[in-house]
From Swiss-Prot:
Reaction catalysed by this enzyme: Endohydrolysis of (1->4)-beta-D-glucosidic linkages in cellulose, lichenin and cereal beta-D-glucans
Similarity-based family: Belongs to the glycosyl hydrolase 5 (cellulase A) family.
Disulfide bridges in this chain: none
Domain of life: Bacteria
Secretion signal, residue range per the UniProt entry: 1-31
Residue ranges with Low complexity bias: 339-358
Keyword Secreted: yes
Pfam families linked to this entry: CBM_3 (PF00942), Cellulase (PF00150)
Classification via Gene3D superfamilies: Endoglucanase-like, Glycosidases
Residues the record lists as binding substrate: 64, 68-69, 95, 130, 230, 262-263, 290, 295-297
Name the UniProt record assigns to this protein: Endoglucanase N
Keywords: Carbohydrate metabolism, Cellulose degradation, Glycosidase, Hydrolase, Polysaccharide degradation, Secreted, Signal
UniProt-annotated catalytic positions: 168 (proton donor), 256 (nucleophile)
Length: 444
């Protein structure tokens, strides 16, 4: 990033507006990774916050089972997901049964490879103890405690690591009967070596019964409760459970969801998926999509034969993958999704100024002079001083800067008096670059 902010090239290309627009935009510098930006995560009043106490929403992708599609879990693919898709979290799904860790403990090496890649790339990573056909997490509780003792010993000082200790308890297994007692023991094992990294705990009925967990929460303050859904099968009743759990102060993490039905294959159901994503973003609930694979099923993100190392074009993505990529890229421009908001419809001015028709005044203010935080934060005020209303949708603002050879970017709209959901941001490359400006942020 061009760090001397008073020397950054600032070039604004304006359309015209109908009313006063006040915006505060914060841009993580291109050298700042998600972990550098947010640091140690924790739970505060049932919501996920970063080390500055600011609410944060994680959005990313899960691997498929490592025993089947582990080749897609590598630094190159994860880097592409970070830089092109905009993920800030990756989930590595290590099955316990079905030729998973219990019969093939060497799969732990792939988990370690994924964690090392995530550390290097500065993204958060979920280590997923993926129980499924084994139903009850207590079946392999001893192995879980051994595994998570090793993971916590290795990564207890790494703020990007998140432990998911029971993917989808099912088969009549209940929160109070089996899951909570198991979670207490495994949490104690983790906390003996790692005092503060996040822990995600699955809930009953394939991680749908978060209401039961909300009514009898675990004592650990940095625990989240998993809800899983598949858009073609699960609808409003599960969204209602999220609202209920949040009203009880429980922190919720959608650590797995799919655009398909619950089989993983029917669909994809994109309108239903959009309803879910809008809801999760509105409630500030973090989410991870299933899954990074080229398997011939609706929930797969990649088309059959896609490269194992990223670089995917539109043709390499499935219908689901294209949709999820769009959602993650759009979500990277949200202000964290922490406060439910209703988009505001811009209105025509009732008392326009006396200036010449179409006159536009733009005021820019730098609100961050700290050279050590790798961020650009700005406030922009735009006013139509003419006598004729002009549409806000005609407005474009470009902010030019140099990326210093680091292509990743995190963009956030902190506030806008027309509602942050009505502001769209993206990055682009100018036709003619200079040694001081080779990128721009477009605000519309």
């Amino acid at each position: 990033m061009w760090m001397r902010r008073n020397q950054i090239v600032r070039k604004l290309t304006l359309g015209v507006v109908t009313t006063v627009l006040g915006m505060s935009l914060s841009f993580s510098a291109l050298s700042a990774t998600p972990v550098e930006t947010h640091g140690q995560l924790s739970i505060e009043n049932g919501r996920l916050v970063d080390e500055q106490g600011k609410r944060v929403q994680l959005r990313g992708v899960s691997s498929h089972g490592l025993q089947w599609f582990g080749d897609y879990v590598n630094k190159d693919s994860m880097k592409w997901l970070r830089d092109d898709w905009g993920i800030n979290v990756f989930r590595v799904a290590m099955y316990t049964a079905a030729d998973g860790y219990i019969s093939n403990p060497s799969l732990a090496n792939k988990v370690k490879e994924a964690v090392a890649a995530a550390q290097s790339l500065g993204v958060y990573i979920i280590i997923d103890w993926h129980i499924l056909s084994d139903n009850d997490p207590n079946i392999y509780k001893a192995q879980a405690k051994t595994f998570f003792a090793e993971m916590a010993g290795l990564y207890g000082s790494s703020p990007n690591v998140i432990y998911e200790i029971a993917n989808e308890p099912n088969g009549g297994v209940t929160w109070n009967g089996q899951i909570r007692p198991y979670a207490l023991e495994v949490t104690d094992t983790i906390r003996s070596k790692d005092p503060d990294n996040l822990i995600i705990v699955g809930t009953g009925t394939w991680s749908q019964d978060i209401h039961d967990a909300a009514d009898n929460q675990l004592p650990d303050p940095n625990t989240l409760y998993a809800l899983h859904f598949y858009a073609g099968t699960h609808g409003q009743f599960l969204r209602d459970r999220i609202d209920y759990a949040q009203s009880r102060g429980a922190a919720i993490f959608v650590s797995e969801w799919g655009t398909s039905d619950a089989s993983g294959n029917g669909g994809p159901f994109l309108p239903e998926s959009q309803t879910w994503i809008d809801f999760l973003n509105n409630r500030g609930v973090s989410w991870v999509n299933w899954s990074l694979t080229d398997k011939s099923e609706a929930s797969a993100a990649l088309a059959p034969g896609a490269s194992k190392s990223g670089g995917w074009t539109e043709q390499n993505l499935s219908t689901s993958g294209k949709f999820v990529r769009e959602q993650i890229r759009a979500g990277a421009n949200l202000g964290g999704g922490d406060t439910p908001t209703t988009p505001t419809t811009p209105t025509e001015p009732t008392n326009p100024g006396n200036g010449t028709t179409g006159d536009v005044v733009l005021q820019y203010r730098n609100v961050d002079n700290n050279p050590s935080d790798d961020a650009i934060r700005m406030a922009v005020n735009i006013k139509n001083t003419g006598s004729t209303p002009i549409k806000l949708s005609d407005l474009q603002v470009r902010y030019y800067f140099h990326d210093d050879g680091k292509p990743g970017a995190n963009l956030f709209v902190d506030w806008a008096n027309v509602g942050p959901n009505n502001i769209v941001t993206s990055t682009g490359t100018p036709a003619a670059s200079t040694d001081k400006a080779n990128r721009y942020v477009l605000v519309t």
